[in-house]
Amino acid sequence: MNIAKMIDHTLLKPNATKSEIEKLCNEAKEYGFASVCINPCFVDLAYSMLKDTDVKVCTVIGFPLGANTIETKVFEAVEAVKKGATEVDMVLNISMLKSGDYDYVKKEIEEVVKAVKSYGDIVVKVILETCYLTVEEKVKACQLTKEAGADFVKTSTGFGPGGATVEDVKLMRQAVGENFGVKASGGVRTAEDAKAMIEAGANRIGASAGVKIVEEWNKLKMS
């Protein structure tokens, strides 16, 4: 297993600098990560550094609260794709989900999916922010995401009070079935963490500690 190809090399902190993003992109090229996951203002910079490589540019939409209007999320996603992003991680509207307005939640995801996929094979990951949800809400969010035509469910923003757990990843994998993406993010900091998430059903890992994870993985010769 090539662990690097399962990692979105991530830097989303609010005080990230251009030079830190450049370092992130260089590390992604060196280690062969699946993507870099960065804030929207850095998409053009990341694209300029990675356009001739296999590393994808991933950005976040409606981040980190998920509380923007549908129109705003669509605009943000389309703008990112026009600047070179080929993966978008959108935060679903947590308030609407918890209010039981499932039509809104599904429509929002559908609108973003439809808008970005008109530009090509863009991967859409939907962040559930599992730390705020009941088991029933997590399952419902997974079902809505799948029905709406997205490609992945993702656990967390990393900005909430809790990140990915093995239990949540197992539940999400069970809810979406085999042929769908599950991304574990938030608090995945070691090779052991990554292995636990993959064994639970994740096929993508979001982590700012990607380099450390790969180096530990190779040293321990995990499979």
Swiss-Prot record:
Query: What EC number(s) are associated with this protein in UniProt?
Result: 4.1.2.4
Q: What is the lineage of its organism?
A: Bacteria, Bacillati, Bacillota, Clostridia, Thermoanaerobacterales
* Keywords assigned: Cytoplasm, Lyase, Schiff base
Q: What does this protein do?
A: Catalyzes a reversible aldol reaction between acetaldehyde and D-glyceraldehyde 3-phosphate to generate 2-deoxy-D-ribose 5-phosphate.
Can you name one GO molecular function term for this protein?
Answer: deoxyribose-phosphate aldolase activity
Active site at 89, 154, 183
Database matches in InterPro entries: Aldolase_TIM (IPR013785), DeoC (IPR011343), DeoC/FbaB/LacD_aldolase (IPR002915), DeoC_typeI (IPR028581)
UniProt-listed SMART domains: DeoC (SM01133)
Q: Which gene name belongs to this protein?
A: deoC
Gene3D superfamilies named in the record: Aldolase class I (3.20.20.70)
Q: Which cellular compartments is it found in?
A: Cytoplasm
Q: Which family would the database say this protein is a member of?
A: Belongs to the DeoC/FbaB aldolase family. DeoC type 1 subfamily.
Record keyword Glycoprotein present: no
Q: Which NCBIfam families match?
A: deoC
Class of the enzyme per the UniProt entry, highest EC level: lyase
Question: Which pathway does the database say it acts in?
Answer: Carbohydrate degradation; 2-deoxy-D-ribose 1-phosphate degradation; D-glyceraldehyde 3-phosphate and acetaldehyde from 2-deoxy-alpha-D-ribose 1-phosphate: step 2/2
Gene Ontology annotations for the cellular component aspect, listed alphabetically? cytoplasm
Q: What is this protein called?
A: Deoxyribose-phosphate aldolase
Q: Which reaction does it catalyse?
A: 2-deoxy-D-ribose 5-phosphate = D-glyceraldehyde 3-phosphate + acetaldehyde
One GO BP on record is: carbohydrate catabolic process
Q: Which domain of life is it from?
A: Bacteria
| One Pfam entry name | DeoC
